[in-house]
A protein has these predicted regions:
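Conserved, structured core segments of small domains
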Residues: 1-104
Length: 104
């Protein structure tokens, strides 16, 4: 199954005014999800340039929602970010991506 995650920053100005501790946690956060991408779990993730304030997004290939929650709980930035998770009942992947699930 696929899950869309919206990662909410603690404030709209977060990307430009992170504390030293927040920046270090976010560097570990990127490394953590980059490892998940190398494992084929994270399909795409990164910041979204919303004019109201930047937030993060990701699409993940997981066994179930509990699997996704375990990964979110282990995220090094868990104490900074909040998450909204949405199951994607179906998805179409581009050529070369394993597991294409076309709409009926």
């Amino acid at each position: 199954m696929y899950v869309f995650i919206r990662a909410n920053n603690p404030r709209p100005t977060f990307l430009v005014d992170m504390t030293t501790e927040e920046r270090a946690a976010m560097q570990r956060h990127v490394a953590y999800w980059t490892e998940k991408a190398a494992q084929g779990i994270a399909i795409v993730f990164g910041p979204v340039a919303d004019p109201k304030g930047v937030w993060g997004m990701g699409v993940y290939r997981v066994d179930d929602l509990a699997h996704m929650q375990r990964m979110l709980d282990a995220d090094p930035a868990r104490h900074i970010l909040t998450y909204d998770a949405f199951e994607m009942p179906r998805g179409v992947l581009g050529p070369g991506e394993p597991g294409v699930h076309p709409f009926p």
